[in-house]
Amino acid sequence: ESNSKARRGILRRAVFSEDQRKALEKMFQKQKYISKTDRKKLAINLGLKESQVKIWFQNRRMKWRNSKEKEVLSNRCLQEGLQENYLSQSAMNFASPCPSVWEVSQEQTSPRWKEKSPGNSERLTSTQPPPRANSSQSPLYLYPDHDTANKAVTSSD
């Protein structure tokens, strides 16, 4: 069976040494797509076949894309959790990939927290204002640049 695989060009999984991995990673940080000449040079320097370098770069790009997508998704979840959105997502027919803040808070409540928490009627009848945020804390911005006051919002009616 190994003879038939060899004839079809199917290779076993390459096991790279630490030095080879470091050199490949270093090149990947410089450029996500490697040119044919760079691939040839790198393969010679590392004692690998060009096809191994090519496949390593393909696999590494896929890993890089997947990690970027996960990062974007987790940032979206974070922003969704921080936004004060009183509209029901189900009413807008929008399914979120993130659990709602309510769902997470329900999973993480402890009996001690419930004992110390005022009851519903006590919360509704309380005349005390809600606690104020500490003004010495720096504000949290959800936008890449926090100079949003100068940005005009236009609507298309």
Swiss-Prot record:
GO function terms (MF aspect): DNA binding; DNA-binding transcription factor activity, RNA polymerase II-specific
Biased composition (Polar residues): 118-139
DNA-binding stretch(es), residue numbering of this chain: 9-68
SMART domains membership: HOX
Main location: nucleus
GO BP terms, alphabetized: regulation of transcription by RNA polymerase II
Location(s), subcellular: Nucleus
Annotated organism of origin: Gallus gallus
Name under which the protein is recorded: Homeobox protein DBX2
Keyword field contains Nucleus: yes
Keywords for the protein's UniProt record, in alphabetical order: Developmental protein, DNA-binding, Homeobox, Nucleus
Tissue and organ distribution: Localized to the central nervous system during embryogenesis. It is found restricted to the rostro-caudal and dorso-ventral regions of the hindbrain. In the ventricular zone of the spinal cord, it localizes to the dorsal part of the basal plate. In the adult, it is detected in ovary.
Function description: Appears to perform a very early function in establishing the identity of a subset of cells that originate in the region of the ventricular zone in the developing spinal cord and in the hindbrain.
Annotated Gene Ontology cellular component terms: nucleus
Highest classification ranks of the organism: Eukaryota, Metazoa, Chordata, Craniata, Vertebrata
Family, as annotated: Belongs to the H2.0 homeobox family.
Residues covered by region (Disordered): 105-157
